[in-house]
Amino acid sequence: MRSDMIKKGFDKAPHRSLLKATGLKDEDFDKPFIAICNSFIEIIPGHKHLNEFGKLVKEAVRAAGMVPFEFNTIGVDDGIAMGHIGMRYSLPSREIIADSVETVVNAHWFDGMICIPNCDKITPGMMMAALRINIPTVFVSGGPMAAGKTSKGEVVDLSSVFEGVGAYQSGKISEEELKDIEDHGCPSCGSCSGMFTANSMNCLCEVLGLALPGNGSILAIDPRREELIKQAAEKLKILIERDIKPRDIVTEEAIDDAFALDMAMGGSTNTVLHTLALAHEAGLDYDMSRIDAVSRRVPHLCKVSPASNWHMEDIDRAGGISAILKEMSRKEGVLHLDRITATGQTLRENIAHAEIKDKEVIHSLENPHSEEGGLRILKGNLAKDGAVIKSGATEVKRFEGPCVIFNSQDEALAGIMLGKVKKGDVVVIRYEGPRGGPGMPEMLAPTSAIAGMGLGADVALLTDGRFSGASRGISVGHISPEAAAGGTIALLEQGDIVCIDVEERLLEVRVSDEELDKRKKEWKRPEPKVKTGWLGRYAQMVTSANTGAVLKVPNFD
């Protein structure tokens, strides 16, 4: 066993002595040592129940004849961090999480790992670590939150609350109505109930094969999630016996399938960023053009909030992720069904008995929302290395208009609230990319304000930052190269005409190459917003969004 490094041989007497101080007995040294990587944090609703969750995982590991050791990671609640300096720390926290898990697990030579994530950057951070460490691993997330209901019976979620702010600001609802939405938008523990980033990543974890069937859709408060815990411990033991590791599971084909599910569900645009980072950790050469190829062959089968009034509980009721995958598998060439997963079985075997139980929620191949996926990769002179739009969250497929430029999210939000944005405008929020932000903050507050004011179909928003999974409308993010790297978005001037063509996958500014070259020569890189601390270091090391915004290792040659 891998853990023999710290427990076998006469020279490991000091190590065993220390381990006995934690409560171990001699007989425990013949059992696999299992890292329980938890993320219990009281300020995050999706994680406040994970303390008890961790206890159940440890019980299940002991029952399977293994020895559990629990530790915790940090986390950031993107909703609470939204709209202020805290959002700069969200994406960088992914790297800290990955590094911290790598540190604990490799320092103590565990034989296997069960990861308990749930929310936005915590799931991909742990997944990156699992691929980096590459020991048998199973993921069991904390589960989605249920949707809420206002006193009038209206179904609401977190995106309803954000959009309620814009609606109140524009006089569409009263303060009492906003308070009613606030009080009921997040009714329980769990990851926010729509197809936002947390749930998108937990669903992708399931299709990648690192988590068990049901991981993405079974609610946090559903007793079936406890059954998942028991299964996870049993399956981990099998993975250890068969030496099946994350890099055996997360192949190029698995990533294709993850993006295929993402397209079928219209998941968060953040999945592109995180899954490219996973490919990097797995040592795979996977670029955005391959994502676009997946998008072209996968139909959009279900719309989940914010693209509709359906939520994760409805997806679960309709058959869950397995039912979506089973329906997708009917179309030749969409999925790679014979690859191994954390169940010890193939994807084909995992979904063999799944079926759609509500075709209003999960559409059939014969009745898709669209013939192509709910995410699109756009390119053009404004995004030479690519940009991402959640095409399934807008009915508008082509938009052209003059740009209104803001050099920060704060500046943009103030301008929107002051009425500086009107119908037909293209709002540009720049210098908010991985380096420029720093941290590539999400733009949920501006998009929600625009939607809440009733301008969601009449105003487009472009940014080198990110969008929350709760964002909707004509929102193009991840524009690469970013402004801080001298990308074309930095060269835009007020009133330049920008064209977004979703069907043709184009993002263009109607300015000649000669004029752009002239502007590039005159452009000067702004001073970094942050020069010290973690964010200062992050801004120096982070790479572009089109490569997953991973950190580059200095070249020592």
Swiss-Prot record:
InterPro entries recorded: Dihydro-acid_dehy_C, DihydroxyA_deHydtase, DiOHA_6PGluconate_deHydtase_CS, ILV_EDD_C, ILV_EDD_N, IlvD/EDD_N
Record: residues binding [2Fe-2S] cluster: C119, C192
PROSITE patterns hit by this protein: ILVD_EDD_1, ILVD_EDD_2
Record text on cofactor binding: Binds 1 [2Fe-2S] cluster per subunit. This cluster acts as a Lewis acid cofactor.
Gene Ontology biological-process annotations: isoleucine biosynthetic process; L-valine biosynthetic process
Modified sites of kind N6-carboxylysine: K121
Membrane-traversing stretches: none
Keyword match Cell inner membrane: no
Name this protein carries in UniProt: Dihydroxy-acid dehydratase
